[in-house]
Amino acid sequence: MSQQTTIRKLAELVNTPVDKLLVQLAEAGMKFSGPDQVVTSTEKMKLLGFLRRTHGKAETPAEAASEAAKKITLNRRKLQEVTVSAGRTKTTVNVEVRQKRTYVKSENEGSGRATPMTPDEERADILAKLAASRQRNLDEQQRLAESDRVRDEEIQRKRDEEQAAKDRAEAERKAAEEAAAAASAPAPAPVAAAPTPSAAAPAARAPSSPSSAPRPSRPGGASPASRPSTPARPDDRNNAAKHKTRGSHVMVAGVEDDDATKRFAGQLHLSAADRARRSNVRGKPTGRPGSSSSRRGNDNGRGSNQANSGPHGFERPTAPVVREVAIGETITVADLAQKLALKGGDVVKALFKMGVMATITQSIDHDTAALVTEELGHKAVRADNADFEDALLAHAEDAQGDTTTRPPVVTIMGHVDHGKTSLLDYIRRTKIASGEAGGITQHIGAYHVETDRGVISFLDTPGHAAFTSMRARGAKITDIVVLVVAADDGVMPQTKEAVAHAKAAGVPLIVAVNKIDKAGADPLRVKNELLAENVVAEDFGGDTQFIEVSAKVGTGVDTLLDAISLQAEVLELKAVAEGRASGTVIESSLDKGRGPVATVLVQQGALKRGDYLVCGIQYGRVRALFDETGHQPGSAGPSIPVQVLGLSGVPEAGDDFVVVDDERLAKDVAQQRETKRRESRLVASATNRMEDILAQMGKGEGQQVLNLVIKADVQGSVEALKQSLVALSNEDIRINVIHSGVGGITESDANSAAASKATIIGFNVRADASARKIVESNGVDLRYFSIIYDVIDQVKQVASGLLGVEIREEIMGIAQVRDVFRSSKFGAVAGCMIIEGVVKRSKPIRVLRDSVVVFEGELESLRRFKENVDEVRNGNECGIGVKAYNDVKAGDQIECFERIEVARTL
């Protein structure tokens, strides 16, 4: 291969155009006719030296190294603090100053000495330089000490002069006060004030001064000097004496300068003393312009009014300031910091020390805020935010009037399928149970029935375990509880729960033993079982009425109604029949054609169409009233359930309602309640999020989450579904209801489910067209239900699918090693006796020595009578070769096991 390099090849090597390379060669003094000419190594080095000189570098690497040895670069970093003013506060900022300096050693420095110095000479030179440096430092210290001494002497001299001036001014002030006190004696006419010794010279020149000459009298009035003036008060004379002394001039009573005349124009009725006093109040001296008094006020450079004024407006507190902070139900950290006059970070830091992790924008409850306030040294008081609630209470008190007897409110309670709704059907002579999905009641039904014994309002509550809150709500608003117990089934869990609700509400109990017409009915068993729940029948010496009835044939229904009427008479139920109405929401729903619908039970007053009412966090005007038959009554009195249309939203079941005079008050009360509820919910959600984070930190990634969106026809069903499904959560899976509501499944519900990968549960509702489109496009799991049993079962199945499978180990057999043989093919072979179960060649094994696992692996061979077998059962001998393990000893046990997958369930 030729070592010659052409210009073209060199241009390719250095990645430079051929024309440019030819130009550079020509500039370097080398002529070439074309790109195909050969370039020698000498010419290459010559070109390289030319290019280095052009760029300001050494021609050769040796020269570059020599130049680098003559240079030294020093980098210096210095940290310092700079104070920056930010408004009224000052902030300290850390600043890093970086300096870079390059020193070049000149050629004559190295050539200044022909021969290098000996070590002794170098040591002497270093000592001489050190002594010179020490002398320079000593001289500098002496110079600084001398300048400090001169400065201190100058400061001390100025302080002495200022103190002497203050002493002279104090002596002059005391002399002036004594002279003013002597001149304050009653005199027949005002006379000129006696000049003090210090003011003698200016007083002698006073007549020649044109500004001190008396002015001619003003037209239309006497001159101030000739007008009688009121006697000046002692303090006014003292002030005037001060100004006379400090101003070093004499003021004659009634003679004023031009500046004073301008200032008091239109106030000629004032005396000289009053003018002097007002001048002092305004902070301006009463002396003539140009005098020392008007120029500098007093010897200290301050106005004379400051000498007589009280303390200044702000004094730095010497003790910690304890503030009284008003805190509501919730408060944000930023608002609390503002009330405490602290930075938000300080409050957040105090919360962290107390174990509460919160940001500056997060809301905290009253107890936490009170604790951190006391921790910071201040006092916390509860803020009174019940302004609108007080107005609402005043409205309720105004509605008091004459009371009349009202119908009783009777709640039918009991276990599921014990015949509660069927009994009410017979009383109403209608069929209601057939209209309920699955034949069970899934929301509170409110009815009022006119019987021969008067009007009775009935509330039919669900008996399923999921509707605990509904039954508790029904017990709170009722007067009498009728406990329905099937004679053939006895006391069940929801029966006991209903008894507990009735006792907690303090409501009298009447037991209706239903299904008495069936063959297996045993009323005595029911009485004995209820006796364990402290419900004692009258024939057992108790006070509870037991009525045997049959909802199918009507046996004992009249006796039950008589018992209800008798109990109502004993209770003497009364209420105000006229005036503003108030009561409780029994159930609520969202009707697509009518809007929010609330079933309410009126407890006081009369509810009429057009009334403004507040219902929890909702408000509105009553547009229409409907009873359980669909008719529109003119009004609803006490103990009458009706449906109300016209609210701003769907209220929660169990909320109280009250009628107010105007819509403004109703809106204010509803908004205040909503604000409080939202703040409380934020505090609770923040706490739950923190608990979830801590729980996840402790559990790792083991817990699965199933997100749900629940929509139902009525509020009570939503509440029951949420409680029942969330209760399915355990340490392995968590049921999370991300959204719930009343009404059909809308587009926003579908979007929310798609974003969070949630399952939509529609209970007696359906999805609209837009929601179905989103569900289909995003693959959202949408399920419709009408019976609460099915909802719970389906969610259990879905949750169990998320749990996956559990791997379990099952021991199949155990072999006892009796002796160990050696094999050229397998190594150590254990002669064993199967003492338990069966040993299979395809299963994994463990080797146990003294009941301790020493090896885990698999079998390499399993033989019986020199034949390979797949398994050996209990009581037989065999030879076992363990794969990759030769340390088998007599007395060991070989355990054969298998791994099986078990589906996990809730």
Swiss-Prot record:
GO terms for cellular component: cytosol. It comes from the Bacteria. The keyword Nucleotide-binding applies. Residues 439-443 are annotated as: G2. Residues 550-552 are annotated as: G5. Residues 178-232, 287-305 have a biased composition (Low complexity). Residues 134-250, 269-317 are annotated as: Disordered. Keywords: Cytoplasm, GTP-binding, Initiation factor, Nucleotide-binding, Protein biosynthesis. GTP binds at residues 414-421, 460-464, 514-517. Residues 514-517 are annotated as: G4. Residues 405-574 form the tr-type G domain. Residues 460-463 are annotated as: G3. Residues 414-421 are annotated as: G1. It is found in: Cytoplasm. One of its GO terms (molecular function) is translation initiation factor activity. Residues 136-177 have a biased composition (Basic and acidic residues). Belongs to the TRAFAC class translation factor GTPase superfamily. Classic translation factor GTPase family. IF-2 subfamily. One of the essential components for the initiation of protein synthesis. Protects formylmethionyl-tRNA from spontaneous hydrolysis and promotes its binding to the 30S ribosomal subunits. Also involved in the hydrolysis of GTP during the formation of the 70S ribosomal complex. This is Translation initiation factor IF-2. The lineage of its organism: Bacteria, Pseudomonadati, Pseudomonadota, Gammaproteobacteria, Lysobacterales.
